[in-house]
Amino acid sequence: MLSYEELRQDAEIRTYIERADESLAALGYTEHSFAHVTRVSETAGYILKTLGYSEREVELARIAGYLHDIGNLVNRVDHSQSGAVMAFRLLDHRNCAPEDIATIVTAIGNHDEGTGVPVNAVA
């Protein structure tokens, strides 16, 4: 299984997060860099661990949290959907298991503050 720590060190993913943050900064949004995605990732993992979810689900929550705003690279509007599509590609190319991809992509695609719903434990 692909790990959260492996993703954090991935140069391609780091580039997308950096550029998404730059785009949002140019539009006047608050910080969405590594501090933000790391905080979301760690918080999601902590919540699931505290609630007694499996270590696998905790890891998937960390991964989803880390990638959740990557769609801001494309545009802030509908960033959860574009982020889910981007995450699918990134995870698939890293040989992530299909069931893990499905869980992560569903969580990312449903995280938008205006329309998101917790469709699974990772979301």
Predicted regions and their residues:
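Generic serine detector
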Residues: S3, S23, S33, S41, ...
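Divalent metal-dependent catalytic cores for phosphoryl transfer on phosphate-bearing substrates
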Residues: L51-A123
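Active-site flanking loop/helix segments enriched in acidic
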Residues: R14-K49, Y66-L73
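N-terminal glycine-rich anion-binding loops that anchor highly charged ligand groups
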Residues: A11-E18, R56-E59
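Non-catalytic interface/linker regions that flank or bridge core catalytic/transmembrane domains
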Residues: M1-T15, S23
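Charge-dense, low-complexity intrinsically disordered segments
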Residues: L7, L27, E31-F34, V77, ...
